[in-house]
C-alpha cells in the first residue's frame, strides 16, 4: 500500500513503523481470529487500491473473495470495514458491475456455505438464525463500558509517537483532491467512528 500511494523507495518504512507499535507487538504472536481477519481486510483494501480499470480482473476477483472469507471469520463484523470503504468503493463503483467481482464473492462464501450445510443437521434451526440472534443479543445487552469516544483517544495513544504524524497526514490528505484521501483519511476515520458507535 505504501508503494501504491507514495513510492517504492521508502516502502520499507511502513512495516518498520508497524512493528514498533504496541498493538502489533502484542497481537502478532497470537494465532487468533483477529489476526486472520485483519489480514483479510488488508488484502481487501490492497486489492481495491490495485483496481485501476475493468481489466484488473484478478484484483476485482480478490476483492470479492476476501468479503466471504472475512464473513466466515467474524460474521457481521465484516460490514465495519466495508462501510468504511464506501467512499472509495463509490469512487471506483464500475467494478461492482463486473462478473469477476460477483464470482469472487461466491468463491469467498463457499467455505462458509460448506460449514453451514455441514452443521445445520445437528441444530434445531438454521445457523443463520443463531448468528442473527447473537448479533441482536450483543446489540441489546451491551456490556461495553467504555464511552463512545474511547477509540478516538485510545488508538492515538496506543500508536504513539507515530500517531502525531498520522493525525497531521490525515488532515493534509483530507484537504487534497487526490483519490488517496479515501483510504488514507476517510477509511480510518469512518472505521474508528463505526467502532465507536457499535460495541465489538
What are these regions (language model features)?
Residues 51, 69, 73, 78-200:
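Transmembrane-lumen/periplasm boundary regions of multi-pass, lipid-linked membrane glycan transferases
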Residues 18, 37-45, 62, 80-84, ...:
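Hydrophobic core segments of transmembrane alpha-helices in multi-pass, intramembrane catalytic enzymes
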Residues 3-9, 44-62, 70, 173-174:
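Membrane-interface transmembrane helices that cradle and orient dolichyl/undecaprenyl
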Residues 17-18, 24, 40, 47, ...:
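Hydrophobic residues within membrane-embedded alpha-helical segments of Major Facilitator Superfamily
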Residues 2-20, 38:
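Transmembrane-helix signature of polytopic, membrane-embedded enzymes
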Residues 23-37:
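Short acidic/glycine- and proline-prone juxtamembrane loop motifs at membrane-interface regions
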Amino acid at each position: 500500500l505504501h508503494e501504491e500511494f507514495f513510492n517504492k523507495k521508502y516502502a520499507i518504512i511502513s512495516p518498520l513503523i508497524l512493528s514498533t507499535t504496541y498493538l502489533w507487538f502484542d497481537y502478532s504472536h497470537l494465532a487468533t481470529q483477529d489476526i486472520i481477519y485483519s489480514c483479510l481486510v488488508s488484502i481487501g483494501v490492497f486489492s481495491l487500491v490495485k483496481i485501476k480499470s475493468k481489466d484488473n480482473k484478478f484484483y476485482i476477483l480478490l476483492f470479492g473473495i476476501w468479503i466471504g472469507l472475512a464473513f466466515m471469520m467474524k460474521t457481521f463484523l465484516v460490514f465495519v470495514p466495508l462501510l468504511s470503504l464506501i467512499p472509495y468503493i463509490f469512487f471506483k463503483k464500475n467494478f461492482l458491475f463486473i462478473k469477476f467481482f460477483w464470482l469472487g464473492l461466491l468463491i469467498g462464501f463457499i467455505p462458509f456455505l460448506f460449514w453451514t450445510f455441514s452443521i445445520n443437521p445437528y441444530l434445531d434451526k438454521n445457523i443463520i438464525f443463531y448468528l442473527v440472534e447473537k448479533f441482536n443479543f450483543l446489540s441489546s445487552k451491551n456490556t461495553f463500558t467504555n464511552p463512545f469516544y474511547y477509540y478516538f483517544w485510545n488508538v492515538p495513544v496506543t500508536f504513539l509517537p507515530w500517531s502525531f504524524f498520522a493525525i497531521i497526514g490525515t488532515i493534509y490528505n483530507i484537504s487534497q483532491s487526490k483519490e488517496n484521501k479515501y483510504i488514507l483519511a476517510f477509511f480510518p476515520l469512518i472505521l474508528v467512528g463505526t467502532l465507536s458507535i457499535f460495541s465489538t
